[in-house]
């Protein structure tokens, strides 16, 4: 069946449910896991009223710290379950980063949440989940 699962997480509560589901599935299948969190590239200007310049170094440092925290949590959960887990932080548009990581790591299933940090603003699926489902050649398990 599946031998190598990619579990995508942004650290949100719903993504945490996808992590738990993916790890339990990996354990049941005897599969290994690659956990990925994707950070969008820095944007110099934050649009909107009262726009301000956000220093790239500060953004990159905060993104790296957040990714390390999120991925360390996944690795700790995997270790408790006895599941082999590699962690990866990618700077890319989220859907593209997930798809590319699955391909690069040879994953045969992507596990991800239906919605991420941007909230449940869409009725069925968030925009990143839709993009992954639309463009991935690897099967995708969406968790709600």
PLM feature spans:
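A short acidic, glycine-rich active-site loop
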Residues: 54-69
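Small/aliphatic-rich secondary-structure junction motif
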Residues: 3-54, 77, 81-86
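Histidine-centered beta-alpha loop that forms part of the nucleotide-sugar donor binding/catalytic region
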Residues: 10, 92, 114-117
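Conserved functional loop/turn residues at catalytic and ligand-binding sites
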Residues: 1, 37, 82, 93, ...
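Short, well-ordered secondary-structure micro-motifs
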Residues: 18, 45-48, 98-100, 122-124
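Structural beta-alpha unit
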Residues: 76-110
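Gly/Ser-rich helix-loop-strand patches that form or flank binding pockets
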Residues: 24, 100-144
């Amino acid at each position: 069946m599946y031998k190598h699962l990619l579990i995508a997480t942004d650290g949100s509560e719903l993504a945490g449910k996808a992590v738990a589901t993916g790890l339990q599935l990996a354990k049941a299948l005897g599969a290994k896991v690659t956990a990925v969190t994707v950070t969008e590239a820095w944007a110099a200007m934050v649009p909107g009223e009262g726009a301000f310049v956000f220093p790239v170094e500060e953004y990159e440092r905060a993104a790296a710290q957040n990714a390390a925290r999120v991925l360390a949590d996944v690795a700790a959960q995997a270790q408790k379950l006895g599941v082999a887990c590699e962690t990866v932080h990618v700077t890319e548009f989220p859907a593209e980063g997930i798809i590319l990581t699955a391909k690069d790591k040879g994953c045969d299933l992507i596990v991800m949440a239906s919605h991420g940090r941007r909230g449940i603003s869409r009725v069925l699926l968030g925009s990143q989940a839709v993009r992954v489902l639309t463009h991935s050649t690897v099967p995708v398990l969406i968790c709600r």
